[in-house]
Amino acid sequence: MAFGFFNSLKQGLKKTTAALGLAGLLSARLDEDLLDELEDRLLVADMGPAFVSELMERLRAEFKSKKIKQSSEVLPWLKAQLLAALKQGEKTTSSSSLPSIWFFLGVNGVGKTTSVGKLGKRLSNNGFSLLFAAGDTFRAAAAEQLQMWADRAGAQLISHREGGDPSAVVYDACEAAMHRKVDFLLIDTAGRLHNKKNLMAECAKMFRTVERHGAKIDEVFLVLDASTGQNAVQQAKLFAEVAPLTGIVLTKLDGSAKGGVVFQLVKEAGVRVRYVGVGEKIEDLLDFDEEAFVDAILAE
């Protein structure tokens, strides 16, 4: 998986690796000028001022204390630091009770419904039974789009009329999932741009609906579009404040020239990237491999 993931990412991250240009930079003598240039290049890769500042503060301390003396020592140190940053969030394990319930949160246009469909198809291919819930009752044709994915994944679908209460959809989906004894219930949600108070209330209501059935929510995924850069960072910050996130599904990483934004997203959301989209095909939604990603972004 790591090799395929690395190859899938390497092409898409060419602009990021070119912006970093570490091969040439780290062949020069290690001094303050080189460290300043490295800091500038990390910022150009969209790793974010706060993250880069913390990273460079640690590197400068290593340099001043002479723990790092040569430029050739910087790349291994940098790889270790970036890998640790991506692994800071806990990976959760699903409960043994059925159905395993997964929520998908995020604003409109980031690929939420597509992510539900692709992950559902993967689960179906592994022999699991599925139910999809069309919790986005506000977007025109949202249920129809999810029905298309349900057909492809071999999943059943619970949906209500357009403009209905999302929590009512969740309620009926929980009832159906338990009665039909399906393995997984995947819940698509509305992606309107909310204010924080309304978003918190809507999320809390849906989560309470699940709890009233005596069920446990195993995953709350935040779906983000890597190509939107700082907008995705702000979304990560907002949703982390209103929902108990368990992981990030990152779409359109193949089309983003700013691959460094991943580090900001993990920092703001406080959870790890779990899946990443590197293309349009169903099989292009991959398990996120932190080591392969760091190797790809620092490729010389």
Regions found by a protein language model. Give the residues of each.
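P-loop/Walker A NTP-binding module and the surrounding RecA-like catalytic core of P-loop NTPases
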Residues: L83, T92-E300
